[in-house]
């Protein structure tokens, strides 16, 4: 009996020590992008934090989340300051030059928010020859990149970049800009929270979301992708997305 108790105690101590020594991965995000990431109380919550937690648990890691400015995410993970980034991050060829991406876990749609009485009724109005609107975006996002190319560089208006989506929407509410280009899901949250705004029916851009890592961190990317595949197959990740974005 003493030998059995001693063995059980040794096993318990070993498991406890293993849990205590579990390595922590740091995920950076910009928590102003509901429902993918946002602050609730003193916690960063949303689709990305929940998927990251599930993936880290599957890989055997603890998870730490750092909330920082969106335009510092790529440089931060590329330099090794963070282990990975999940922030509704769109996969682009330009970003692929600086970081490695995981497999895609969600699809995003860029839309346009306007005031209900806006003369802008479609994407075509915004991109028409002779158009001269001021368009708000979040700095360093794909919405900003697309708008610069389609609108400002094409001489069809001006692009105003803001630190986050909320500030862009507040500028629209206060009449400082004519519209906001942003992803569909946070757009829904902003329109619901601010009377007098609407989302145009026409889609601006469709894009893929993925986690990103330092270019040389191939081992972690492979582990992440393997866990992502398992959690997608067993329904965990679809359930997380469905929790925040119910199927219509």
Predicted features along the sequence, with ranges:
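Alpha-to-beta junction loops
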Residues: 61-62, 78-87, 131-134, 164, ...
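A ligand-binding cleft/hinge motif common to bilobed small-molecule-binding domains
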Residues: 72, 89-97, 145-149, 171-174, ...
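Short beta-strand-centered segments that line the small-molecule binding cleft or hinge
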Residues: 74-88, 96-109, 197-200
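Ligand-binding clefts/hinges and TM-proximal coupling segments of bilobed small-molecule sensing domains
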Residues: 62-64, 142-160, 195-201, 226-248
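Flexible hinge/capping segments at coil-to-helix
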Residues: 114-134
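Short helix-initiation/N-cap motifs at beta->coil->alpha
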Residues: 49, 64-77, 121, 159-174, ...
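Extracytoplasmic small-molecule ligand-binding "clamshell" domains
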Residues: 23-88
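Periplasmic-binding protein-like
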Residues: 31, 107-114, 184, 188-229, ...
